[in-house]
């Protein structure tokens, strides 16, 4: 049996056992019932049931010696995820697994980048640091087709060494970002990457940036908040990121103008089309080909609305479903709306993942647009109901904060 010995409750799913093995880097788990060992589950059990095992990918990632090798390993991920998609069919589980594999690729590229800096005579890290994932990566909600959103935080080395230290990290970040690009993660068009000097900052500089966004919520600041405020540490000194998160969660509930502007921005960013007269008439008469942009008109407004509520309540969780559950637990969302939002999120994310697989095979297709004609009647109904739930969320958020003076 692998060491250390980790236990998992008998009530957990096989997928939870798989994720625990991947995260802990072990091949066996002790199954317990009321804290009493009742059995053992291993990688072999998963391989017997599933034919492939994600842990094998993780082992390959950790031993890869180049970005090109990692790119080949990532290609192996696609059929594996598609198989699990067909068998598991749970969006939260799938996005967690996809994100975990992407995290491992990023961490290996960081290790390779650090090694390369030393080989070139640049030395080791000049200060403690953490590589941060932002946006969907920060929320652990990545799908198979995604671009980069990352940043870097480092401990202030003092005014004499600050410029030199920042340049070291910028040069290092270029190696990681280039490696991610080789692995199939395009560079962010908005330059939300650690190679951007505005996102390669000390602790104090990050606090100043976040404070400025909260105090002066201009349209540009709100756009940044929609990406930067979903963040987590992937590698390095995690405490640097947690201190930043705790400070943000202390300030955001008291930033009333920011919350007001965020709620208005949530509406301006786009409303699901399901209640528009054009949609209703065409749906009733069967005219034309109705399409929905799953990112722009479904996931994005859902994520934005939940983020605003989470910031107002000082909730530290970053995954949208975890935020929804915590909001319900705190009485910030009704149980009815909470359950409806969770169902809507799961269904829409599954549609998006399915669309990603189709797009991966045919690059001429959009990865986010889905036509109602491509769905069966039950799926059409579920999609429309999900969009109506998102409209309810937007109205709830605006009613709560839109009128704040």
Predicted features and spans:
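A short, polar/charged loop-to-alpha-helix boundary motif
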Residues: 44-60
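Histidine- and aromatic-rich ligand-binding microenvironments
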Residues: 13, 45-46, 147
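Short, structural beta-strand-to-alpha-helix junction motif
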Residues: 1, 13-14, 66
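A nucleotide- and high-energy phosphate-metabolite-utilizing enzyme signature
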Residues: 56-405
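A glycine-centered beta-loop-beta connector
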Residues: 21, 29-46
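The conserved cystathionine-beta-synthase
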Residues: 7-25, 32
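Residue-level detector of anion-binding/catalytic polar loops
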Residues: 6, 27, 186
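Bateman (tandem CBS) regulatory domains
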Residues: 1-5, 147
């Amino acid at each position: 049996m692998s060491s250390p010995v980790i236990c998992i409750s008998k009530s957990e799913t096989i997928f939870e056992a798989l994720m625990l093995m991947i995260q802990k880097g072990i091949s066996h788990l002790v199954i317990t019932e009321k804290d009493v060992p009742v059995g053992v589950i291993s990688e072999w059990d998963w391989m017997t049931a599933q034919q492939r095992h994600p842990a094998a990918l993780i082992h390959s990632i950790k031993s890869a010696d180049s970005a090109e090798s990692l790119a080949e390993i990532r290609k192996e991920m696609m059929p594996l995820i598609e198989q699990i998609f067909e068998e598991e069919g749970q969006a939260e589980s799938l996005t967690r697994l996809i994100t975990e594999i992407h995290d491992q690729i990023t961490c290996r590229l960081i290790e390779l980048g650090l090694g390369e800096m030393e080989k070139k005579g640049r030395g080791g890290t000049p200060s403690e640091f953490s590589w941060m994932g932002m946006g969907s990566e920060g929320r652990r909600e990545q799908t198979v087709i995604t671009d980069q959103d990352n940043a870097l935080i480092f401990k202030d080395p003092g005014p004499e060494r600050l410029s030199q230290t920042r340049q070291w990290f910028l040069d290092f970040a270029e190696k990681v970002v280039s490696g991610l690009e080789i692995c199939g993660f395009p560079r962010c068009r908005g330059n939300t990457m650690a190679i951007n000097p505005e996102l390669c900052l000390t602790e104090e500089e990050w606090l100043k940036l976040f404070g400025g966004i909260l105090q002066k919520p201009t349209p540009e600041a709100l756009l940044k908040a929609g990406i930067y405020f979903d963040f987590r540490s992937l590698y390095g000194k995690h405490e640097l990121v947690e201190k930043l998160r705790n400070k943000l969660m202390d300030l955001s509930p008291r930033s009333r103008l920011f919350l007001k502007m965020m709620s208005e921005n949530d509406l301006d960013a786009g409303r699901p089309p399901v209640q528009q007269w054009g949609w209703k008439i065409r749906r009733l008469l069967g005219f034309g080909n109705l399409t929905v942009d799953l990112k722009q008109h479904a996931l994005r407004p859902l994520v934005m609305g939940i983020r605003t509520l989470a910031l107002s309540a000082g909730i530290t969780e970053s995954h949208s479903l975890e935020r929804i559950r915590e909001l319900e637990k705190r009485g910030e969302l009704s149980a009815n709306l909470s359950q409806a939002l969770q169902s809507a999120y799961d269904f829409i994310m599954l549609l998006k993942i399915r669309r990603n697989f189709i797009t991966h095979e045919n690059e001429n297709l959009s990865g986010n647009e889905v036509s109602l004609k491509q769905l069966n009647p039950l799926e059409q109904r579920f999609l429309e109901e999900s969009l109506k739930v998102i409209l309810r969320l937007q109205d709830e958020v605006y009613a709560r904060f839109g009128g704040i003076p």
